[in-house]
Amino acid sequence: MLKAGCNIPDVLGNFKYTEVSLHEVDYRVLYTGVASDLKRRIWTNHLHGNGGNSTLRKTLGSLFGYQKIARDKNYQINKKTKFGAEDENSLTAWMERNLLFAYFANDKRNELESFLIDSLLPPLNVEGSKAATLHRVHELRCDK
């Protein structure tokens, strides 16, 4: 979630956010996801990983216009990309200042994710999203 008073580049044109209130503070929902180990996923992949192993990082980095580079030596086969070290570090710092991660355990995580995507329309979700920004998010994330 995007913290109050924080923004991301609106290169998608007219970002529409759903706001949620936690402890009487409003946050704008950007993304929702599932994982078998959310703490590891958030800490290792999203906050301290790279754009090659985090959909959230790849999308945010693409919004910031960061240059994509080959993720590993298998690029010719898998076409996976990430961002350069300086951009990855800048993205990590931005995420730590501007985002709040909220999570909870649930036995039906896939159903819950579908429900949250359908009802909150997070603009940065790619799979399963009906958000108006979906096509543009795909374009920005496209590995060229």
Question: Each PLM stretch: what is its role?
Answer:
Residues 1-90, 94-144:
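GIY-YIG nuclease catalytic motif and its immediate N-terminal context
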